[in-house]
Amino acid sequence: MTQNLQMADRFDSSAVEQALYKHWEEQGYFKPTENPSLPSYCIAIPPPNVTGSLHMGHAFQQTLMDTLIRFNRMEGNNTLWQTGTDHAGIATQMVVERKIAAEEGKTRHDYGREAFINKIWDWKAYSGGTISQQMRRLGNSIDWDRERFTMDEGLSNAVKEVFVRLHEEGLIYRGKRLVNWDPKLHTAISDLEVENKESKGSLWHFRYPLANGAKTADGKDYLVVATTRPETVLGDTAVAVHPEDERYQSLIGKTVVLPLANREIPIVADEYVDREFGTGVVKITPAHDFNDYEVGKRHGLPMVNVMTMNADIRAEAEIIGTDGKPLTTYEAKIPADYQGLERFAARKKVVADFEALGLLDEIKPHDLKVPYGDRGGVPIEPMLTDQWYVSVKPLAEVATKAVEDGEIQFVPKQYENLYFSWMRDIQDWCISRQLWWGHRIPAWYDEAGNVYVARSEEEVRQKHNLPADLALRQDEDVLDTWFSSGLWTFSTLGWPEQTKELKMFHPTDVLITGFDIIFFWVARMIMFTMHFVKDENGKPQVPFKTVYVTGLIRDEQGQKMSKSKGNVLDPIDMIDGISLEDLLEKRTGNMMQPQLAEKIAKATRKEFENGIAAHGTDALRFTLAALASNGRDINWDMKRLEGYRNFCNKLWNASRFVLTNDKLDLSAGEVEYSLADRWIESKFNRTVGEFREALSQYRFDLAANAIYDFTWNEFCDWYLELTKPVFANGTEAQKRGASQTLVRVLEKLLRLAHPIMPFITEEIWQKVKGFAGIDADTIMLQPFPKVVKSELDESAEMQIGWIKELIIAVRNIRAESNIAPSKGLEFLVRNVSDEQRKILAENDRLLKAMAKLDSVQVLSADENAPLSVAKLVGNVEVLIPMAGFINKEAELARLTKEIEKMRGEITRIENKLGNEAFVAKAPEAVIAKEREKMQEYQNGLEKLQTQYQAIENL
């Protein structure tokens, strides 16, 4: 019986993908089962910001996650991919503040806290689903009914529970300490939100007079202090020298007079001081510098805060002791003409006043890194503020041990050292933020200043037996976004309730994330989870067993993608395509700097002169998987994307060949499997083994390459061709053998490729399943292929491998000698073994058909051959007689011209690369391109010379 069907000439991803995804979602294929006996597999997605849209980094990591999820679902595991979005406190608040400013000319203060928060919820309802829809476009097999948001009621309850319990355990406290303060946004920000920018600055050398007649070793009555921040001079409470610096040892314990403020401050010895920096004497300003803060604590120095929350100079200094409490025994007045000055205006005035007093020694140019708030865009100010803190050292010890003991493994392993270095030097974590949007701190104050922590105001009153008429005010601050994110793996599963989901899916299996948030998020998840989630034996649970750390996706030149550089690529544009005009608008629209827009437009036109073509989701996903080498940053490559779109078409066309073949015979009857049939089954099983091994090591690149290599190089280029002689001249039993093998291997190949390429594999599988006798709804619930050892056939692999080499040798001779592929050739071989002679005899018809041979003849060792072109295949000599095929002299003359032309190109590039001026000025990418061209020309020259030699030897 022959059966076939109609298939379109090419795979149209745009006509298939969204309809298929809708069907999958409606059928509930993404949902975990209720069966507790099945082994579970769970990944919690790093929650993207609700403000955001999908970028290439998201697409990259989510492709890897979905590959694992789909693979494990097909393995029969009860699979959950827990998704959701993060409320992203500061980012979201800024988006909505900008929106109301632009549309209504209002600020959040015009609205008031409650109304403004409602405005954010309205905005979230309107635009918060953008990223979810984009994730659907990527083919992510997520149970959307379980989508969570970090401000959902359940997650908010978990946040309050954690805060209250940590406070009850004495691990959360309120104190006045130094934080990164954004004077524009008026909030503390985390280290992750601080961007250190290279800046050309100055190093001012000021003279601080020694008090009480003291002198330096060389007789001076002053110390020269080097500083990059003159504006904080009024907050100095000491100067410091290195204890082993002989220049100043006699002065340790003495005092200097602080200019402008006219108060004495001590000279302290501290190993923090770099003797080579400036003069080896530094000012210590504990209220305005993180290093000075630590020095101040070691030496019991008071902290003199001279700045307001706007980073202007205060009218009256705030003086705090090392215990964080106000200090009334220390006096530090601020001169009247500094009061109210903006910090950089104060800097200028301090320098001018030192100069007027004859105390400015010198000014040196100095390169430094200035910390900026990444959202406010202004230099941050270390600021003494009242904040809430988590005492994390006890939590960190347990979390560090979990990685040391192998309960959690980092892939690549080198990231464990980064984790350890952070965890072993961990500082208390500032968790409060001066924002309106976020989890409000569950603490209340009465008018006497007493603080009450509980899950609600009602619980405060019950717990502390407070009368109903006692006025309570809730803390205005919200929690750092990373606090709620730190509970992500267990709060999304219903904790603090002991839900069946928590029992079934926790700990999760793997976290896929970037190296930049190992400390800010990964470490905090480990700390919180192990503190709050225990197994049935009371042992702390880890949040995940493996952390797979990805590199960054960079542009083709290796630059980080950013809006300001205008090199951002939208993964949806890779899928659907985008015109040049729309791409230019996306990259340059609404830019503040027109000059920058012009530069970006020029670069975009050069790189994408015709815009970006549609490639489909499968090609994008396959490219991302194929580029995922362990832990390294990835330079995006449009050519690879185009190549993998071609790969999708190759798979589609191979399927068309199989399913529309009118000679395909799947009828009942005698079946004979050929050597080629046994070979392709064996090669497929080896590919399955390679894929499984690669995936178990998180080598997505090797897994993708295994599929690509088998599909293109074995199945399409060889096996499909090897079946053609069978269908043309084989017996009915042989045709059935080839037909069954084609369908069986194609169906298994689709299952193998499905985790990476879900859409095209489902679309083809729906057509294949009838041929394969499968009655099922979807490929995604079919079993993933396993290695069948009985189908591994080393003999078949060896025999077909050798036959392929013979065919390739003949094809190379044709190409080198300009003989048409259709022209029949005589084929002579010499120096064959008895086994090889047998293989030739059994596969004579196959070899003739595949290599277009008129005859196959084995020569004895001493038998003379006619004038031939020869190739060696191992020890075997392949000879093709050339009589009548070519005009030797004419062909040699043609090749001589080609060789000279190629040598000229090589000389041209050698001269270019030998030009020092060119190499110094040209971008690295241009130089790399020239070297690539040089290699191509050298390879071409080698081939031409080989061809010349072969013909000359005729």
UniProtKB/Swiss-Prot annotation:
Domain of life, source organism: Bacteria
Disulphide bridges: none
Described function: Catalyzes the attachment of valine to tRNA(Val). As ValRS can inadvertently accommodate and process structurally similar amino acids such as threonine, to avoid such errors, it has a 'posttransfer' editing activity that hydrolyzes mischarged Thr-tRNA(Val) in a tRNA-dependent manner.
Similarity comment text for this entry: Belongs to the class-I aminoacyl-tRNA synthetase family. ValS type 1 subfamily.
Record field: catalytic activity: tRNA(Val) + L-valine + ATP = L-valyl-tRNA(Val) + AMP + diphosphate
Major site of localization recorded for this protein: cytoplasm
Gene3D superfamilies reported for this sequence: HUPs, Isoleucyl-tRNA Synthetase, Domain 1, Valyl-tRNA synthetase, C-terminal domain, Valyl/Leucyl/Isoleucyl-tRNA synthetase, editing domain
One MF term in the entry's GO annotations: valine-tRNA ligase activity
Name of the protein in question: Valine--tRNA ligase
Motif ('KMSKS' region): 560-564
Coiled-coil spans in chain: 883-954
Subunit-structure text: Monomer.
Entry GO terms, CC: cytosol
Keywords tagged on the record: Aminoacyl-tRNA synthetase, ATP-binding, Coiled coil, Cytoplasm, Ligase, Nucleotide-binding, Protein biosynthesis
InterPro entries recorded: aa-tRNA-synth_I_CS, aa-tRNA-synth_Ia, Anticodon_Ia_Val, M/V/L/I-tRNA-synth_anticd-bd, Rossmann-like_a/b/a_fold, tRNA-bd_arm, tRNAsynth_Ia_anticodon-bd, Val-tRNA_synth_C_sf
Gene name of the encoded protein: valS
Record EC number: 6.1.1.9
CDD domains: Anticodon_Ia_Val, ValRS_core
Binding sites annotated in the UniProt record for ATP: 563
Cellular compartment(s): Cytoplasm
'HIGH' region, short sequence motif: residues: 48-58
BP GO annotations: valyl-tRNA aminoacylation
Domain notes: ValRS has two distinct active sites: one for aminoacylation and one for editing. The misactivated threonine is translocated from the active site to the editing site. The C-terminal coiled-coil domain is crucial for aminoacylation activity.
